Amino acid sequence: MVNTMCLNLTIPKKCFYWLFILWALFGFSITNGESFDDNPLSRINNYIEYSSIFSSSGQVSSDDLNNIMKSGVKRIIYLAYSDQDRSLLNEDRLVKNLGMQYIHIPVEWSNPETDDFLLFAAVMQQNPSMPTLLHCQVNFRASVFSFLYRVIYLEVDIKKAKSDMDIIWRPNETWTKFIFQILEMNNINPACDECTW
């Protein structure tokens, strides 16, 4: 708490001390790191960048699409239904008009299916080096698909991939069962040190 004497400017040394503390706590992180303004993609709901060519997020806006295109993304894959309240009207047309590829794989929230993931993986494998944003409404579906794709196809360590997914959410019973099912199909054990399912 700032000393009230500092506010009256009667003890300048303490003022400088408190200003330095505030700068160290708040200003240093803003000036020495990438701020929100440096990367407009970081404003997208639950945006996470896994590599320079693969990221996932929640619902994007039309303004976000311009920034996504400018960042070098060439393909957008959408995993939710287009009739949801927060869906972007005409997202497919907007994306295509910006010169990016658009793929829509509607995944039922309460019943994700193996074929949904297999279709997604097939799309990714057609051109694995194409910069891609995978998104849904809040990055729950997308973060699970990202986790699975990274573990199965990119051979990312389960602990690392799960840690990234846990930043967004800890999958509920339905989605954990889905994860285990897909991993089992690929002969991958979901166990890892420090992994809690």
State each model region's role.
Residues 17-27:
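Bacterial N-terminal signal peptides
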Residues 139:
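Substrate/cofactor-recognition hotspot
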Residues 12, 27-31:
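Intrinsic disorder/low-complexity segments in short proteins, especially the signal peptide
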Residues 6, 30-132, 144-197:
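Cys-dependent protein tyrosine phosphatase-like superfamily
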Residues 135:
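Short, surface-exposed ligand- or partner-binding patches at beta-edge/loop junctions that are enriched
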Residues 4-19:
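Bacterial N-terminal signal peptides that target proteins for export
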